[in-house]
Amino acid sequence: MILVPLITVTVVAGTILVCYILYICRKKIRTVYNDNKIIMTKLKKIKSSNSSKSSKSTDNESDWEDHCSAMEQNNDVDNISRNEILDDDSFAGSLIWDNESNVIAPSTEHIYDSVAGSTRLINNDCNEQTIYQNTTVINETETIEVLNEDTKQNPSYSSNPFVNYNKTSICSKSNPFITELNNKFSENNPFRRAHSDDYLNKQEHDDIESSVVSLV
C-alpha cells in the first residue's frame, strides 16, 4: 500500500521536472527548429532546380536527336535526287552525237538550248544556214553609200587662200591673194599693179592680169 503513493509522487515529480527543463530550454529548441526549417527549404529549392535542369537536358537531347534525324532525311533526299540525275534514263544519258561534231538532245535542239539557255542556235532549213540569236543579218542586196570623190567642197569652208571657190560673187577684200573678176580694182590691194585708164575698160587685159596674179 505504501508503494502506490510513492509511485504517484515520483511520476508527478518527474513530469514537473521535464516541463521545467523544457521551459528553460524553449529558446534553444526554437532556434534549432527554425534552423532545421531553413535547411529543409533550401534542400527543397536545390532539389527543384536539379529537376528542372534534368528536364532541360532531356529536352536538349531530344532536340538534338530531332535535328540529326532531319539532317539524315535531307541527305537521303539529296542522294535520291543525285541518283535520278545520274540515271541512264535521264536527260544526260539521252544525249547523242550529231555528225560527230556537236552533242544534241533527242529533240534535235542544240546542246546550248538546254544547257546555256542564252546562246541559242536556230536551224533554218530553208536558207540552210545557222543564225545566232541577238544578231543582225545584213542582206547582200543592201547598198552602202560611198562618199563621192567628186563631191563639191563647200565654199564657205575653203582651206586654200589662193583658190577662189566662190566664183559667182565678188571676192572678199580681206584676202589679197584672190583676184577680182571684174574691172573694179581695189585700191587697198598692195599685190595688184597699177593700171592705166586704157586698160580698165578692156576685159582681155583684165583676165590676163588676173590669171598672172593668181599664179603668183
Curated annotation (Swiss-Prot):
Listed transmembrane segments: 2-22
Bilayer disposition of the protein: Single-pass membrane protein
Keyword presence, Cell cycle: no
GO cellular component: host cell plasma membrane; membrane
UniProt organism field: Variola virus (isolate Human/India/Ind3/1967)
Post-translational modification remark: Phosphorylated on Tyr-112 and Tyr-132. Phosphorylations activate the host ARP2-ARP3 complex and lead to actin nucleation.
Subcellular location, record wording: Host cell membrane
Listed name of the protein: Protein OPG164
Extracellular domain ranges by topology: 1
Pfam families hit by this protein: Orthopox_A36R (PF05950)
UniProt motif NPF-motif: location: 160-162, 175-177, 189-191
Record-listed Phosphotyrosine modification sites: 112, 132
Coiled-coil portions: none
